[in-house]
Amino acid sequence: MDLSEPIHDFLLVFLGSGLILGGLGVVLLPNPIYSAFSLGLVLVCTSLFYILSNSYFVAAAQLLIYVGAINVLIIFAVMFMNGSEYYKDFHLWTVGDGITSMVCISLFISLITTISDTSWYGIIWTTRSNQIIEQDFLSNSQQIGIHLSTDFFLPFELISIILLDALIGAIAVARQ
């Protein structure tokens, strides 16, 4: 989108605050339905970020796949769960919650220090220097594929690991 800089900055701040509030809603709301709706807000804000950066195909894929399919599937699965058994003897904070939060905070701090201390030069082995790319002959989906295999190789692989963890967690919850 061709927006003026103040409007673009306002939309970035607005979408960023929507992402932060939605993310907090996902992890802090006790009702799983509200948590799933907060996840939908996060995914919609992410797709709007893609629209702001002129990546319309990625934004449409984000909306169709994640909001339209996966989030609806999550809400559908949560509605079939028996919610009353999850709220019996509800304690606001337990010892396990404290231990878990300390482990998560320490992992987060170690991850941030690792990311800031790592030299990321040379991580991606396939670079643009050893490829002959004619931009005129490539479609948008081919350009996305090239970017995913060159510039965004590491984030793409990290997202696949996160999705694999989510799938394993969903299977573990479903088996109980």
Swiss-Prot record:
One GO CC annotation: chloroplast thylakoid membrane
Entry annotated with the keyword Thylakoid: yes
Record keyword Translocase present: yes
Transmembrane domains' residue ranges: 10-30, 32-52, 61-81, 92-112, 152-172
Main subcellular location: plastid
Pfam family, one: Oxidored_q3
InterPro entries for the chain: NAD(P)H-Q_Oxidoreduct_6, NADH_UbQ/plastoQ_OxRdtase_su6, Nuo/plastoQ_OxRdtase_6_NuoJ
Oligomer status and interactors: NDH is composed of at least 16 different subunits, 5 of which are encoded in the nucleus.
Family: Belongs to the complex I subunit 6 family.
Function, as annotated: NDH shuttles electrons from NAD(P)H:plastoquinone, via FMN and iron-sulfur (Fe-S) centers, to quinones in the photosynthetic chain and possibly in a chloroplast respiratory chain. The immediate electron acceptor for the enzyme in this species is believed to be plastoquinone. Couples the redox reaction to proton translocation, and thus conserves the redox energy in a proton gradient.
Protein name: NAD(P)H-quinone oxidoreductase subunit 6, chloroplastic
